[in-house]
Amino acid sequence: MKMNKSLIVLCLSAGLLASAPGISLADVNYVPQNTSDAPAIPSAALQQLTWTPVDQSKTQTTQLATGGQQLNVPGISGPVAAYSVPANIGELTLTLTSEVNKQTSVFAPNVLILDQNMTPSAFFPSSYFTYQEPGVMSADRLEGVMRLTPALGQQKLYVLVFTTEKDLQQTTQLLDPAKAYAKGVGNSIPDIPDPVARHTTDGLLKLKVKTNSSSSVLVGPLFGSSAPAPVTVGNTAAPAVAAPAPAPVKKSEPMLNDTESYFNTAIKNAVAKGDVDKALKLLDEAERLGSTSARSTFISSVKGKG
């Protein structure tokens, strides 16, 4: 398959460019539609994949160990995830999340965008998907937002997610959940080490699709930005799309010993000071993060046995 580009121009809204903080030279030179660094994938191999339809109605979840597919192409390691996205609903915003597993490993995603003729149109390397700290309703993750503008006549776009041998040699520095929680509630940051996640061929991916109802003023051509830039892709004939695979359900995982100890101590201290509301909030957060002892610690503390 030739790696010729079908996208028309890379554009940025004036407001988006002005609001992008601290753009470095490397960020400015990043051009999503430059697919020369992406693996060369034969058309026949792409046609053999099952492309899971994703729309705005729900977030598509894929556990690569069970829902991934094999694509035996040089430059790609382990299973891949393949999605199809409607291209006739306006400008698209795709948010891809790769969740950290047990504070020890994470899948470093690369994304190749193809038009409806399976022609490579944009490439987002693993460096585009940056580490996001855990929050009240979110886990540690690698995440990136891609803005795509399908050309007129496009019916579908294709999103191929994979990792590489180079990515597997690298790691991601995480933030311990106890530190993240302490920062969020204004407590002192505990002096505990941050975990490091190795990159693996397995992981939990989440893809969310949105459309922008209001059009923005676009200027171009530009080189790019650290902020997501809309990429125009396009051609006309649409290939057939296979049925989606079912999405597995993620199980909650136990937290690390240091994190467990931090929350248990914080719960005991809150109860000792008579601040039961704070203790309950700590309990809820600890159990959300996978604690198996926070509830018993809370109960024993309230009973005066903590």
Swiss-Prot record:
Cell location: Periplasm
Entry keywords, A to Z: Periplasm, Signal, Sugar transport, Transport
Superkingdom assignment: Bacteria
InterPro entries, alphabetized: MalM (IPR010794)
Annotated Gene Ontology cellular component terms: outer membrane-bounded periplasmic space
Keyword Signal among UniProt keywords: yes
Signal peptide from the UniProt entry: 1-22
Key word Signal present: yes
Pfam families: MalM
Single GO biological process annotation from the record: carbohydrate transport
Summary of the function given for this chain in its UniProt record: Not yet known. Might function in the uptake of a still unidentified substrate.
Family to which the UniProt record says this protein belongs: To S.typhimurium MalM.
Protein name per Swiss-Prot or TrEMBL: Maltose operon periplasmic protein
Native organism taxonomy: Bacteria, Pseudomonadati, Pseudomonadota, Gammaproteobacteria, Enterobacterales
